[in-house]
C-alpha cells in the first residue's frame, strides 16, 4: 500500500473553526492509523485577509488539541514562484492561455446571463488567440484551457462517483493580473509537491473538486483519493453559525473544555465505532477508518459535549483538578496557599457538580475567603427576604460550638430548626445564600467544616450590614 500522506490546509483569516478542527483531526487520525504522514499547510495567498494572529491561533489550537503535524509548516505565500513556473509550463504545452478580458466585461456578461436566466460560464475570446493579437496596455491573467468535450468524474469515498460535464466548468484563472497564484492552482501544485495521497475535507469543497481535477489532469498528476464530509450543523439543523454558540477552538478552551474531551466529541461528530462514546486519542488512532464516516450532517449538541467533558474531568486526579481550577481563578484573583488547600479539600464535592473547568472555578470561588463575596441574583433575593432574627440566632448558636465539624454543625442546625418549628431546608436556604452567594451548592456542612468557624461567621454577619442589592 502507498504511504498515506494527508494534510490540513487552513486559510489564516480568523480563529481555528470548530469544523476545521474536526477536519484536521480526521486527517491526523487517518495518517496515524496508517503509519503515514500528516502535514500542515497555511493557505495565505490572500494577503489582505491573512493575519499573523490567525496563524498563531491555528498553531496554538492544534497543539492544544494534541494534533501534531510532521515536518515544517508550508506557507503558500512563500511559494508563488513555483506556482508561476507551473502555470507557464501549462502555457507552453497549450493547456493554458493569456486572457486580457477586463473584469467589467465579465461582470456585464454575468449580469446579462442572470437577466436571461441562463447559467453563466465565461468563454474568453482569447482562448485560441496568439501573441500577435495581445494588447500591450493590459496585464493579462492566465486561465486554464478546460477541454470543451467530455466530463470529469469525482471518485469520492463517501459521496460516491459524481460526474460533471466539462461544459459546466469554466476556464478558471490560475495566475492573477498582479502575478499571484489563485487558490485553485496553488492547492494542486502544493498537494502534488507534498505527495498528498488522501484529501479529507468538508463537502463545501465538493463544488471545487471537479475544477481542481481538471487542473490535475492538465498537469498529468495523479488525483488524490477524495473524501468530502458533511459539515457540522447547529441544533436546529442549519449550517453552523455564531448564533449556535462558540465557533473557535480557543473559545471552547476558555469555556473550560478539556482538549481530550473536545477531540472525543469532534470525532463522534460524523464518525462512529459501534456504540462507543468515550474514545481516547490512542483508541481513535487504532480504530479510525473512512468506512465509518457518516453521510448525514452532525448537529452540535452542548449537552452531549458537557457529558463527555464531565467524564474526562472525573478521570483527572485531585491535584490536577485543583491546579487547573486555581489557574483559572488566578486570572482574576489573588489566591493564598490556604485557599488552595480549601479548594483541594473540597474538590470531590465540586467535581460531581461540574461539567467544565469554568463550572469548577465558579464553585471553587466559595473557598476564596480573602476575596469579596459575589452573590447571584437568586441569592440576593433570598437574603433580602430572609428572617434576619433567625440568622442572628444561627450566628449565636454557631459561635458557641466548640467542635466545628460537619456532623456537629448539621446537628446544631437541626436543633435550631426544631426550636423554631421549621424544616431544616427552610433555614438552610438563606444560610446557603449568605455563605456561598448561590442558592445551589455543595453541602453547606462540608463547606463550613472546610472554611472553619471564623470564615463562616464572617459571611453570616453580612446580615448586619446595609446590603445594597
Curated annotation (Swiss-Prot):
Residue span of the signal peptide, if any? Answer: none
- GO biological process per UniProt: glutamyl-tRNA aminoacylation
Q: Which UniProt keywords apply?
A: Aminoacyl-tRNA synthetase, ATP-binding, Cytoplasm, Ligase, Nucleotide-binding, Protein biosynthesis
Recorded E.C. number(s)?
A: 6.1.1.17
Molecular function GO labels? ATP binding; glutamate-tRNA ligase activity; tRNA binding; zinc ion binding
Q: Which Pfam families match?
A: Anticodon_2, tRNA-synt_1c
The places in or outside the cell where this protein is found are: Cytoplasm
Predominant place of localization: cytoplasm
- The answer to whether keyword Magnesium applies is no
Short sequence motif 'KMSKS' region: positions? 239-243
Q: Which residues bind ATP?
A: 242
According to its UniProt entry, the function of this protein is described as: Catalyzes the attachment of glutamate to tRNA(Glu) in a two-step reaction: glutamate is first activated by ATP to form Glu-AMP and then transferred to the acceptor end of tRNA(Glu).
What is the similarity comment for this entry?
Belongs to the class-I aminoacyl-tRNA synthetase family. Glutamate--tRNA ligase type 1 subfamily.
Name this polypeptide is given: Glutamate--tRNA ligase 2
Amino acid at each position: 500500500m502507498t504511504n498515506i500522506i494527508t494534510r490540513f490546509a487552513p486559510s489564516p483569516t480568523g480563529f481555528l473553526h470548530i469544523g476545521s478542527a474536526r477536519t484536521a483531526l480526521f486527517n491526523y487520525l487517518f495518517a496515524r492509523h496508517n503509519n503515514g504522514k500528516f502535514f500542515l499547510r497555511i493557505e495565505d495567498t490572500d494577503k489582505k485577509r491573512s493575519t499573523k494572529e490567525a496563524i498563531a491561533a491555528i498553531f496554538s489550537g492544534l497543539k492544544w488539541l494534541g494534533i501534531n503535524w510532521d515536518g515544517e509548516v508550508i506557507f503558500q505565500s512563500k511559494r508563488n514562484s513555483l506556482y508561476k513556473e507551473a502555470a507557464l509550463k501549462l502555457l507552453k504545452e497549450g493547456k493554458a492561455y493569456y486572457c486580457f478580458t477586463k473584469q467589467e466585461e465579465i461582470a456585464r456578461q454575468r449580469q446579462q446571463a442572470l437577466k436571461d436566466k441562463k447559467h453563466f460560464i465565461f468563454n474568453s475570446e482569447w482562448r485560441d488567440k496568439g501573441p500577435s493579437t495581445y494588447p500591450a496596455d493590459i496585464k493579462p491573467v492566465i486561465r486554464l484551457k478546460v477541454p470543451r468535450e467530455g466530463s470529469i468524474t469525482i471518485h469520492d469515498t463517501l459521496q460516491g462517483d459524481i460526474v460533471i460535464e466539462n461544459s459546466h466548468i469554466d476556464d478558471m484563472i490560475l495566475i492573477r493580473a498582479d502575478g499571484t497564484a489563485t487558490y485553485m492552482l496553488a492547492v494542486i501544485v502544493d498537494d502534488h509537491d507534498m505527495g498528498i495521497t488522501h484529501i479529507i475535507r468538508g463537502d463545501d469543497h465538493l463544488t471545487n473538486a471537479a475544477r481542481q481535477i481538471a487542473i490535475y489532469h492538465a498537469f498529468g498528476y495523479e488525483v488524490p483519493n477524495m473524501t468530502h464530509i458533511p459539515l457540522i450543523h447547529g441544533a436546529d439543523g442549519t449550517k453552523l453559525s455564531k448564533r449556535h454558540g462558540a465557533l473557535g477552538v480557543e473559545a471552547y478552551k476558555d469555556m473550560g473544555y478539556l482538549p481530550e474531551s473536545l477531540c472525543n466529541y469532534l470525532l463522534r461528530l460524523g464518525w462512529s465505532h459501534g456504540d462507543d462514546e468515550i474514545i481516547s486519542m490512542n483508541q481513535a488512532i487504532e480504530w479510525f477508518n473512512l468506512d465509518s464516516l457518516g453521510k448525514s450532517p452532525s448537529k452540535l449538541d452542548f449537552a452531549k459535549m458537557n457529558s463527555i467533558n464531565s467524564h474526562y474531568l472525573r478521570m483527572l486526579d485531585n491535584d490536577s483538578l485543583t491546579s487547573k481550577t486555581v489557574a483559572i481563578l488566578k486570572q482574576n484573583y489573588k489566591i493564598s496557599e490556604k485557599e488552595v488547600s480549601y479548594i483541594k479539600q473540597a474538590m470531590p464535592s465540586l467535581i460531581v457538580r461540574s461539567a467544565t473547568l469554568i463550572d469548577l472555578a465558579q464553585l471553587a470561588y466559595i473557598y476564596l475567603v480573602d476575596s469579596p463575596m459575589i452573590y447571584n441574583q437568586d441569592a440576593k433575593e433570598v437574603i433580602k427576604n430572609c428572617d434576619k432574627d433567625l440568622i442572628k440566632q444561627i450566628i449565636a448558636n454557631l459561635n458557641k460550638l466548640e467542635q466545628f465539624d460537619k456532623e456537629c454543625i448539621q446537628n446544631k442546625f437541626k436543633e435550631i430548626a426544631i426550636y423554631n418549628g421549621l424544616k431544616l431546608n427552610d433555614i438552610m436556604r438563606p444560610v446557603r445564600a449568605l455563605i456561598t452567594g448561590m442558592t445551589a451548592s455543595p453541602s453547606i456542612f462540608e463547606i463550613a467544616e472546610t472554611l472553619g468557624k471564623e470564615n463562616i461567621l464572617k459571611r453570616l454577619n453580612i446580615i448586619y450590614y446595609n446590603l445594597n442589592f
